Amino acid sequence: YERSDIKTREIEGLEQRKGFLTEPFDTDIQIVENGVKYIVDLENGQKTGFFLDQKENRAAMHRICKGMDVLDCFTHTGSFALNAGIAGAKSVLGIDVSQHAVDCATRNAELNNLQDRVKFEKHNAFDVLGDWSREGKQFGVVILDPPAFTKSRNTVKQAIRGYKEINLRGIKMVKEGGYFATC
């Protein structure tokens, strides 16, 4: 299955393509990484459906999440949240603005029998982190894995402001002595 359907292909003068290269098959596939099972949606997931470049960062969650309350922002498939759950986190909340992502992450929690400790909710991280901070809500581990805020040089300054703002909001959510991870 080919996923060459990102906007930057047009900027580079390449056509966008998406579809089967072989006979059709179920595009929801199961993979295992760091002992965590995932159903990855190749056809409708963000970009390729799963971000393999974050494998080591997800594995690092196993060292810091045991016994902690964890917040995973921009959760997508729930990969950081699920690693926190497998590592023995007391509770994990993953949030994403996409209901499709929340549904996929919830399905992955069930696949790993983590649904009692690992929950997912639909929220805009920019909005909810400010709200929760004002309410005094905090977590032992806060993970931010936001999408790219820029695709061109013209918007780099805006992107820097966006990263600064979301990281400041995330840091305010960390309990004293806790951990803040941003990718």
Each predicted region: which residue ranges?
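Non-catalytic substrate-recognition/targeting regions of SAM-dependent transferases
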Residues: 1-50
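Conserved alpha-helix/loop element of class I SAM-dependent methyltransferases that forms part
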Residues: 52-68
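Conserved class I S-adenosyl-L-methionine
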Residues: 67-76
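Conserved SAM-binding loop of SAM-dependent methyltransferases across substrates and taxa
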Residues: 77-90
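Conserved SAM-binding motif I beta-strand of class I
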Residues: 91-96
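Class I S-adenosylmethionine-dependent transferase superfamily signal
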Residues: 61, 84, 170
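S-adenosylmethionine
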Residues: 125-183
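S-adenosyl-L-methionine
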Residues: 100-143
